[in-house]
Amino acid sequence: MNDWKRIVVKVGTSSITDERGNPSGEKILSLVRECVKLMRANKEVVLVSSGAIASGREIMQKLSKRKDLPAKQALSAVGQVRLMQYYSQLFSIFKQPIAQILLTAEDLRDRKRYINISQTFETLIEEKVVPIVNENDTVAVEEIKIGDNDTLSAKVACAINADLLVILSDVEGLYSEDPNLSPNAVLIRDIYEIDEKIEKIAGPGKGTGGMYTKVQAAKIVTEAGIPMILAKADLENVLERIVLKKEKVGTMFYPVERHLNRRKHWMLFMAKPQGKVYIDDGAKDALLKKGKSLLPVGVKKIEGEFVRGDTVSILDLTGEEIGRGITNYDSSELERIKGKNTEEIKNILGEDFYEEVIHRNNLVLINRGDS
């Protein structure tokens, strides 16, 4: 944890705009200088930057008065170009090449696309390019929307196997209470476990950039073995102090001891389950306590249509999700063999069949003791 090489930096809209909400060349230049400083110290930097819609409002003032989704997407389309102009001009001062990557949730849910994106990042990083990432708001309807750049930055950090995620914000870190409301609020410097208490402090999941989304981002990366630091964006030399000088800045979220491997992490946090498989108490016990694979005999009910190789949710009979996994059977096959033992399955499908619906190597539990 003392020598972070690959760093994902996320910056929010308020951290790169002025008091009127327009992009601030001064603030963006300060951020660019910091990123270049890390690059020249032989670090690898990926920047996740908000600010496209704000940049669009600066240009399209009439359109900015509209509140509908097409207007927001149009503002984002115009603003993303403007935002990248800022970055291109300012990084070019230091002769630092950059690239633009726009993502949707679907790009990360699909395993092949996810791997391809990871490889693209790798190539850019190898070539000493700073990838600048944003959500592709222009095409991101609700079903394929990541929703906020805190979550996006966490998923990018996992996709590229980063050593550290730094979220720069307008707050110093996570406080014990809302510092705007309570004089007794204390900055929490170290968080080793994101439990109910921490989630309660973060508040309800409203909005697209509050403390809740930052804690959820921390949950995603720490489960992948990646630490996260939440710090104030306008702190002078903040990235240098965190990465190069190893100063204690903001709130540090430490990775969990038994973190998920990349494949299982993708299943739990990236993939969209294509169906639901309900299991009996015996199968639940075998998964949770004995680390076994899921067999057809333990399956009670199936919902949704899915094909072999899809990710599905595994639920107990109360409807609580206990895990996710990659299925060896499509939904129609599983419907025929659910609750059946090996001999019965042989009579239905013949000799060529899988013993497991989901092999333990392709299964991840929500509350894990084994993964």
UniProtKB/Swiss-Prot annotation:
GO CC entries: cytosol
HAMAP family, per database record: ProB (MF_00456)
Organism, scientific name: Dictyoglomus thermophilum (strain ATCC 35947 / DSM 3960 / H-6-12)
Family of the protein in this entry: Belongs to the glutamate 5-kinase family.
PROSITE patterns, per the entry: PUA
Coiled-coil regions listed in the entry: none
GO terms under biological process: L-proline biosynthetic process
Biochemical pathway: Amino-acid biosynthesis; L-proline biosynthesis; L-glutamate 5-semialdehyde from L-glutamate: step 1/2
Annotated compartments: Cytoplasm
Main location (coarse class): cytoplasm
Chain sites annotated for binding ATP: 10, 169-170, 208-214
Gene name of this polypeptide: proB
List of residues binding substrate: 50, 137, 149
One Gene Ontology molecular-function label: glutamate 5-kinase activity
Keywords assigned: Amino-acid biosynthesis, ATP-binding, Cytoplasm, Kinase, Nucleotide-binding, Proline biosynthesis, Transferase
Annotated ranges, domain PUA: 274-352
InterPro entries per the UniProt record, alphabetical: AceGlu_kinase-like_sf, Asp/Glu/Uridylate_kinase, G5K_ProB, Glu/AcGlu_kinase, Glu_5kinase, Glu_5kinase/COase_Synthase, PUA, PUA-like_sf
Keyword Kinase: yes
Source species, domain of life: Bacteria
Protein name, entry field: Glutamate 5-kinase
Function: Catalyzes the transfer of a phosphate group to glutamate to form L-glutamate 5-phosphate.
